[in-house]
């Protein structure tokens, strides 16, 4: 076994180093940042992680407390090695690390907790390099475009950083500037990770994370094209124009390129900042409802989904005139377009999950590629235990014990989870990531798995399925029947929501006390 590891790692090192010399030899490269050093970091980190898992768990009986304890320690060490690698190699490595860190209910918590810092601690590009990118892309000096330009970025991410600035006419803008080396590095980094993951799979056949690389291959070119991001922002703004609470920054196309995006500057607090909301008298429950309504509309009705809703990309503020909370949605580089068949099956699956219809859960989970692992798939989608799925996920909130059980199961069922992620449609992968990010926000706000979120989802599913049926029918009577059924279902949901609000309100408490008094008086 040891010889096999050495042989695989050596083969990976030789092939990567030679491919690195070939690739980097075709352009400008700095050996201290790319080349042998960059490849060497990744190879050595992968070898160290692989060796740790093999040697530490070799002589311990699986399933015992000792095994679980040692495995957790190995997870922790490996996660920190990955974090160090991502921070050293930057760019694409940070992007992939962020993706893993967002899968809170799908990978062991040692990884998600460690890698989640990448959302807020990405390295910055030095200001002279930022100026150079603007000069190259806009063909002007920075002083010709802006009267003010803050050197310190508002925030830095894996692919770019954002600066606050003021245009010559006085308009405040946010300027997103791509890290200068990311474009050249991205394809090479993906090749590097792909070869390393293939090497690891030779040693651990149950290791099924090639889907992560396939997603990066597909999405990175889109995320690196800021003109595509601008088009996504405008499309989303048009799709959900009926939502008065949503704000999407306007794009200034005359100053935007594939590497520079100039947009309207909007201020607000991060959506998970409860203290900010309290200071500004923003209703937390109203924010949670609005966010759930927005994403239900994206996923179930339109099939056009913003897939990076981490707290830095979702801001909140109070409208000074209406005193209604507003959501500001930023960073429109990563979207998932759902096919109609996938979207409708996903609608039907969520309706089954909310209704605790086990037969329909099995049918639609299998249609979405889960096979006989459909119970695990249902748990992954809802972040609930199979027992809660059977009882009805809307009937009770997540207990502390259930939350701990779910997190521990992410480690226990990692081979099965990775098998599922490799078998479901590619569209599902970004939805799972999006679900986990939204759940993280709900948990921060203390509104996790609220009934209102399920009501929003149910409404959107009813509307989406009814619209599809109406489009497919040629019969006027059938069209009327579908419309009446839709109206009836939406009416039921409206009544249920009123009952829930009454139960939670002072009026509800008063009615309950009156009913108790009447009951005691009669008896």
Curated annotation (Swiss-Prot):
| PROSITE patterns, alphabetized | PROTEIN_KINASE_DOM
Q: Outline the extent of the Protein kinase domain.
A: 148-484
SUPFAM superfamilies for this protein = Protein kinase-like (PK-like)
Q: Spell out the protein name for this chain.
A: AarF domain-containing protein kinase 1
EC assignment: 2.7.-.-
- Annotated active site residues, numbered on this chain, are 308
Please report the organism this UniProt entry assigns to the protein. Answer: Xenopus tropicalis
Q: Which InterPro entries match?
A: ABC1_dom, ADCK1_dom, Kinase-like_dom_sf, Mito_struct-func_regulator, Prot_kinase_dom
Q: Which GO terms describe its molecular function?
A: ATP binding; protein serine/threonine kinase activity
Q: Which SMART domains would you find in this protein's record? A: S_TKc
Q: Which Pfam families match?
A: ABC1 (PF03109)
Q: Which keywords belong to this entry?
A: ATP-binding, Kinase, Mitochondrion, Nucleotide-binding, Serine/threonine-protein kinase, Transferase, Transit peptide
Question: What gene does the UniProt entry assign to this protein?
Answer: adck1
Q: Which residues bind ATP?
A: 154-162, 176
What family does this chain come from, according to its entry? Answer: Belongs to the protein kinase superfamily. ADCK protein kinase family.
The entry's cellular-component GO terms read: mitochondrion
Briefly state the protein's biological role.
Appears to be essential for maintaining mitochondrial cristae formation and mitochondrial function by acting via YME1L1 in a kinase-independent manner to regulate essential mitochondrial structural proteins OPA1 and IMMT. The action of this enzyme is not yet clear. It is not known if it has protein kinase activity and what type of substrate it would phosphorylate (Ser, Thr or Tyr).
């Amino acid at each position: 076994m040891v010889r096999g590891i050495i042989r695989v790692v050596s083969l990976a090192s030789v092939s990567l180093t030679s491919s690195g010399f070939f690739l980097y030899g075709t352009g400008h490269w700095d050996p201290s940042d790319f080349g042998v050093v960059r490849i060497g970091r990744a190879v050595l980190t992968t070898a160290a992680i692989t060796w740790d898992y093999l040697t530490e768990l070799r002589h311990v009986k699986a399933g015992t407390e000792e095994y679980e304890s040692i495995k957790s320690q190995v997870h922790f060490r490996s996660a920190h090695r990955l974090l160090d690698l991502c921070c050293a190699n930057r760019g694409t490595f940070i992007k992939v690390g962020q993706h893993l860190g967002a899968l809170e209910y799908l990978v062991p918590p040692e990884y998600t907790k460690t890698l989640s810092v990448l959302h807020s601690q990405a390295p910055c590009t030095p200001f002279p390099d930022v100026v150079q990118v603007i000069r190259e892309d806009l063909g002007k000096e920075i002083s010709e475009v802006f009267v003010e330009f803050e050197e310190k970025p508002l925030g830095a991410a894996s692919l770019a950083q954002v600066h606050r600035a003021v245009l010559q006419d006085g308009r405040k803008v946010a300027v997103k500037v791509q890290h200068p080396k990311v474009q050249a590095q991205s394809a090479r980094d993906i090749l590097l990770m792909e070869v390393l993951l293939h090497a690891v799979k030779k040693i651990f056949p149950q290791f099924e994370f090639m889907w992560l690389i396939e997603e990066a291959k597909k999405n990175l070119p889109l995320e690196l094209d800021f003109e595509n991001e601008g088009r996504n922002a405008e499309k989303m703004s048009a799709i959900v124009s009926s939502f008065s609470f949503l704000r999407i920054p306007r794009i200034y196309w005359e100053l935007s390129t594939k590497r520079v995006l100039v947009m309207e500057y909007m201020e607000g607090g991060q959506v998970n900042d409860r203290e900010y909301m309290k200071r500004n008298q923003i209703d937390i429950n109203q924010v949670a409802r609005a966010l759930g309504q927005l994403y239900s509309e994206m996923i179930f009705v339109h099939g056009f989904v913003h897939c990076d809703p981490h707290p830095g990309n979702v801001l909140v503020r109070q409208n000074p005139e209406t005193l209604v909370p507003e959501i500001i949605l930023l960073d429109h580089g990563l979207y998932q377009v759902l096919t109609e068949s996938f979207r409708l099956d996903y609608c039907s699956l969520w309706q089954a999950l909310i209704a605790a219809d086990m037969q329909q859960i099995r049918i639609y989970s299998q249609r979405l590629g889960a096979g006989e692992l459909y119970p695990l798939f249902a748990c992954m989608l809802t972040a609930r235990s199979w027992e809660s799925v059977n009882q009805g996920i809307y009937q009770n909130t997540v207990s502390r014990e259930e939350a701990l059980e779910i997190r521990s199961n992410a480690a226990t069922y990692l081979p099965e989870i990775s098998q599922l992620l490799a078998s479901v449609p590619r569209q599902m992968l970004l939805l799972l990531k999006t679900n986990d990010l939204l759940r993280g926000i709900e948990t921060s706000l203390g509104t996790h798995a609220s009934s209102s979120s399920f009501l929003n989802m149910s409404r959107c599913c009813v509307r989406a399925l009814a619209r599809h049926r109406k489009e497919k029918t040629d019969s006027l009577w059938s069209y009327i029947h579908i419309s009446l059924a839709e109206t009836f279902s939406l009416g039921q949901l409206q009544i249920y929501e009123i009952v829930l609000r009454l139960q939670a309100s002072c009026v509800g408490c008063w009615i309950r006390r009156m009913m108790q008094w009447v009951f005691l008086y009669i008896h």
